[in-house]
């Protein structure tokens, strides 16, 4: 690849300085600008190979600049940078035709690699997308790298009606992602219909999906449209697809292949144009191996896969999510939003959250009603949060194991506002081990030291430190 010319526009001089030196170190020619008007003036006489632009700047913002650049130089790749890493920023950037989206703070080596990829793209004369989608905003929040990947995928799919499979534990927000995919798609003005396979009795699933004719079975007194007909032109979201019975999987596969189906008890084919988004918390590959899910249907659905991380893998998002849910709960209840004490925020980020984002949302709703003061303290948090297995604790251990008992003690201490837990617990732990080992060896110190994995001198020093001599 030929070395290229890079322009950087950002009102933050430190960002300009860092990028200019990093790009120059990679052998690229870099020119920096403080605002969008300077860039447009320079574009009148010359053009770079790639432009990096901040999204929020005084005067003309990055998206307005991007729009003008795409009108004048539609092939010029533009990378949008932002410290406000949310779904709307990502989708808006892609809608306006951005080459990519770079959330701050970014790894400088990754930024340089992205610039080089954009230059290669430009030099190969590939046309970037110019996406025009209008849709309502969503409540998706996430600055964690895994969530940024999700936002990118949604942005890149915003011109497409391709099938998507969403994987993630219960409570991670799979339906929210499905809504976002629909809202930021060409089908945004058409229906979005959701159906949970696990919530419907097996003998009613076919009727729910495909509808039925009058008299098709006992109680079918009228013709009824199924979910496919209701979603015609739009999106059908099939949640917990792994629970779909095999015979219904066969019918679904035929609909996906032919674009038509028969109502239960019907003889006339019904044609539909529906985008399928499926979701599951199960491992579908394993279900296929076990013969519980059709392999051909799996491949038909698994065109694009989105993995939603559990909350424990995106802990940096917990404070922002909690503040958001407290605001939402306050609006719902018509009260002033609660505030989180800094120690409470820290405690929330350390919890296990087996119910993921849904559990955090419900906790914030509970706090809005039950917390005594306007500021939420650690002791205000519901006890079951601490009684559940803590992050990194072996939840598979029996309830009377020492690790479980230690975790319960730590939970109680943290709820009471204790600090320096290690300095409090370590002497007691060592004293207990020493006492037990000496009792086991009938006071023989060298043998006790061997059992504990210490040298004789270490054991003697510990006895002195703990006042056990």
From Swiss-Prot:
GO biological process: nitrogen fixation; positive regulation of DNA-templated transcription; regulation of nitrogen utilization
Residues of the Sigma-54 factor interaction domain: 140-369
Main subcellular location of this protein, as a coarse class: cytoplasm
CDD domains, sorted: AAA (cd00009), REC_NtrC (cd19919)
Gene3D superfamilies named in the record: 1.10.8.60, 3.40.50.2300, Homeodomain-like, P-loop containing nucleotide triphosphate hydrolases
PTM entry text: Phosphorylated and dephosphorylated by NtrB.
InterPro entries per the UniProt record, alphabetical: AAA+_ATPase, CheY-like_superfamily, Homeodomain-like_sf, HTH_Fis, P-loop_NTPase, Sig_transdc_resp-reg_receiver, Sigma_54_int, Sigma_54_int_dom_ATP-bd_1
GO cellular component: cytoplasm; protein-DNA complex
Start-end of DNA-binding region: 445-464
Residues involved in ATP binding: 168-175, 231-240
Subcellular location: Cytoplasm
Keyword ATP-binding among record annotations: yes
Residues covered by the Response regulatory domain: 5-119
PROSITE patterns attached to this UniProt entry: RESPONSE_REGULATORY, SIGMA54_INTERACT_1, SIGMA54_INTERACT_2, SIGMA54_INTERACT_3, SIGMA54_INTERACT_4
SMART domains registered for this protein in UniProt: AAA, REC
Keyword terms of this UniProt record: Activator, ATP-binding, Cytoplasm, DNA-binding, Nitrogen fixation, Nucleotide-binding, Phosphoprotein, Repressor, Transcription, Transcription regulation, Two-component regulatory system
One GO MF term: cis-regulatory region sequence-specific DNA binding
Modification type 4-aspartylphosphate: residues: 54
Keyword Signal: no
NCBIfam families: ntrC (TIGR01818), PRK10923.1 (NF008176)
PANTHER family assigned: DNA-BINDING TRANSCRIPTIONAL REGULATOR NTRC, TRANSCRIPTIONAL REGULATORY PROTEIN
Job of this protein: Member of the two-component regulatory system NtrB/NtrC, which controls expression of the nitrogen-regulated (ntr) genes in response to nitrogen limitation. Phosphorylated NtrC binds directly to DNA and stimulates the formation of open promoter-sigma54-RNA polymerase complexes.
Protein's UniProt name: DNA-binding transcriptional regulator NtrC
Organism from which the protein derives: Salmonella typhimurium (strain LT2 / SGSC1412 / ATCC 700720)
